[in-house]
Amino acid sequence: MGTLTDRLKAYAQSDMYPLHMPGHKRNLTWNINPYDYDITEIDGFDDLHEPAGILKDLTERVNRLYKARESYILVNGSTSGIMAAVSAAVRPGERILIARNSHKSAYNAIFVRQIRAEYIYPHTDGAGIAGEIMPEDIERQYCEFSDIKAVFITSPTYEGVVSDIRRIADIVHSHGGVLIVDCAHGAHFGIGDKFPSNPVTEGADIVIMSLHKTLPAFTQTAVLCVGSGRVDSRVIKKYTDIYMSTSPSYLLTASV
């Protein structure tokens, strides 16, 4: 059977084109020895949990790219960002409206925080593929549960279906709620004019994106972008710290 290293080496040397994540597609442009870049928080290299120098500059560049108020670089994937967003926006015992096609990390956050969940279903086509979340369905849920604190949806879906974030955000905000968008497969949205707008600029309050899925960054890299002040930034930071490793990889961070 051989070792995992043997199998990875054989795959890398094959003529197989990687039609899968990560987005760098085994690009050899950044041909480095990973051990040279694998360090810890030493003088001059900042701290991802308390960025004040070179990593603060990186987060500010992410802010400019996505037009976000604040951004958090993540090396535990969108999983940690989703759990942080849900935890920051909804207190234990409060209610969240969550789309049934959501990533399991959102459900894990609901379980860990003991949040009350209500569900909304995406429209499906004849092939059974999950489609968009309809704004009217969210309005109906608010009519039934007026105490919904946050709405969690996925846009784009794994199949590339995009919901009307602007209309959904307007509805959620009119009821005093927070809109969290899992945009894990849409980190390229808003970059140039050939892609849909990013949810940050469409009114979403917290957006989580996996840089490694569609952009040339290493697996596990992601960002949490804040689009408004509806959730206390100190609380968001607290939960990103809780859910992310205290030994963040500089190799992963550098690939951002």
Q: Language-model features: where?
A:
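Short glycine-rich, polar/acidic loop-and-turn segments at beta strand-coil junctions
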Residues: 25, 77-78
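Conserved PLP-enzyme active-site core in the AAT-like
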Residues: 2-9, 30, 68, 78-255
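N-terminal "arm"/small-domain region of PLP-dependent enzymes with the aminotransferase-like
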Residues: 1-53
